[in-house]
Swiss-Prot record:
Molecular functions per Gene Ontology: ATP binding; ATP hydrolysis activity; ATP-dependent peptidase activity; metalloendopeptidase activity; zinc ion binding
Gene3D superfamilies per UniProt: 1.10.8.60, P-loop containing nucleotide triphosphate hydrolases, Peptidase M41
Biological-process GO terms, alphabetical: protein catabolic process; proteolysis
Listed Basic and acidic residues bias regions: 669-698
Transmembrane segments: 34-54, 140-160
Co-factor binding comment: Binds 1 zinc ion per subunit.
Region annotation (Disordered) ranges: 647-768
Gene source species: Leptotrichia buccalis (strain ATCC 14201 / DSM 1135 / JCM 12969 / NCTC 10249 / C-1013-b)
Protein name: ATP-dependent zinc metalloprotease FtsH
UniProt-annotated binding residues for Zn(2+): 461, 465, 536
Amino acid sequence: MADRDKNDIRKRLEELRKDNNRRNNRQDNGNRSPFSGFLFFIFVILLFTFTLLFHRDIQTYFQEKREISYTEFVSKTQKGDFSEINEKDDKLISQVKENGKDVLYYTKKITDRVGDEPNIISAIGQKKVKLNSLQPSGGGFFLLLLGQFLPMIIMIGLMVYLAKKMVGGSQGGGPGNIFGFGKSRVNKIDKKPDVKFDDVAGVDGAKEELREVVDFLKNPEKYTKAGARVPKGVLLLGRPGTGKTLLAKAVAGESGASFFSISGSEFVEMFVGVGASRVRDLFEKAKESSPSIIFIDEIDAIGRRRSVGKNSGSNDEREQTLNQLLVEMDGFETDTKVIVLAATNREDVLDPALLRAGRFDRRVTVDAPDLQGRIAILKVHSRNKKLARDVKLEDIAKITPGFVGADLANLLNEAAILAARRASDTIKMADLDEAVDKIGMGLGQKGKIIKPEEKKLLAYHEAGHAIMTELTPGADPVHKVTIIPRGDAGGFMMPLPEEKLVTTSRQMLAEIKVLFGGRAAEEIGLEDVSTGAYSDIKRATKVARAYVESVGMSKKLGPINFENSDDEYSFTPNKSDETVREIDLEIRKILTEEYFNTLNTLQDNWEKLEQVVELLLKKETITGDEVRRIIAGEKAEDILKGTEVKEESIQKGSEGIVQTSENSIEESQENKTVEAEVHDSNLKSDTEKLAEAVREITGETGGVLEPTEKNDFDKDSDDNEKNDDDNENSDDSSKNDSDSDDENENSDNKSEKNKKRKSNFKLPSFME
């Protein structure tokens, strides 16, 4: 055992030494600029030339200079201030020491030659001043010679440099190698990522599959003894954001193998043959560092199905890359510890040869998480965040069906941003609710001014959706209803979807009814319709088409699938023109029938719809519980009063006060109920019986409107008068009877209004 450990340690040290040398060479090639040596050589030549030609100018550049007039210059010469005068270009220059500093006096000549200026010549002769004539600026003949030969020198140096790089390019690639296109740009992860399998939640099935891959790399003997062969490739499938790349990072973090990461788009370049060369280079590096894992993200970039036909030549380069990948994966030996891990969300476009057994033996589907998976993901992403006590991640998971891991991480991040906007580091439940609405529907526009007519229309529209959601069997319950504009929507009704593996026919028809609820409510309540139902009608038509064309639930056409083929190269229609016409007629029939059923349901429950509209206009946002309370018979005014009492109690800041207030409200309601029961048992008035009957007719108890006859009301009125004669000696009974009469009159009026609305309503022309 000890010898075996020593051999493993020695082998591991040898691998580390090779990796270190390879890394150092790559760093040297990356840090060294391709033109660094040549540019340094040119820089030295230019610096020497500049110093040689302009050393006098450099010396005089830092001296103090004073330009004086020609007359003053002659005067100073006559006075003997100048001991030496230099003639250069068109200037006369003289250097004088003043107060310990060298001062340079100069003036322009008035003639081309200083010998033609008698004043200067006379002054120089009197004071015996030395006169010098300097070379013109610019270097003269040497600079002219250098200007002719310097370009040739530069060209020769560049050719020598490129020749050396060509020799080096045939031996290896890198940033400085002009022939390094064939080298793969793989990123070898030497430092293990911090991501572990415990950091990946909601995809337990996929984790178990990948744990076996990691275990094989750690304990290969356990599998080889049983005659098992390691999967040569593992393909991660799933919609975007489900955690495929995160699972690959977890594999890299858990396994002790070398991990190579590359994207599918990095194989193909502008030169022919580069992709295949990079595939070969990638697998060579992986074999040198085995046991190893190659992770190819977005493999559909190179693994797309090979085309056939005359126009297939445009994809030759990509197909060569794919062919080389197929050869490399099929060329593994059984004892080679190299596993290919790939991820894609487009399995349908992959080439069948890539998916066959022996290449990608195992396919791991990473689905969207269920309820428990979403709860686990939320817990993982909330580890580094402070959550308030009122936060319930289970409730957030319930209202986010279909959210994947990336969506849930973004949700918590948006909630944290909203908390920071409040200058707080604690996330509240309100922040999470706002984040859900923001991600699902867009940014809220609470400050937007809406006209009263539009606000009323929005209230009817959303109330229609809510009522139909609660009263339609098979529909999901309501979670929230709002008329606050958000994104492109003026308002929305958020359902609380249940986890479903399959969808029944009744559920699909229920979805159509719910979608039509908004338009039907507008048509009945406002006797007009708006463009707000555009998306609802579009979605309802899509559901109806799937009902007939895809899942074969139409009774007329039967269980037949009429969808077009997914093959992009198939142009043969799969149904006749007559069948297309029958499909369109069946879709229209379904939509018309469900719209008619929606109109009937809203007419029969119009009082409940009006109560929801009233509550929406006053609160703008209501919960699903409040909608269900209205359907159960509670009034909008009672709900508003209860909300106001609760808000006042919360503002006092005492939990005890809140509890006492709620208890007192409950006790008062219980007392009223007891008193009503005693009153009912003692008096048994026919008037109260009439009130109960009217409440049942108007739908306050959740029942459906039943047709009523005028004689029933006359009979109840006679019984009411008789009851008044029997109880005329009791003041309390008279008062209660009076209240009952008022209530009956109001209920009677509402019932008459409802019947009048039903009698006056006209069906749309397309339904007549």
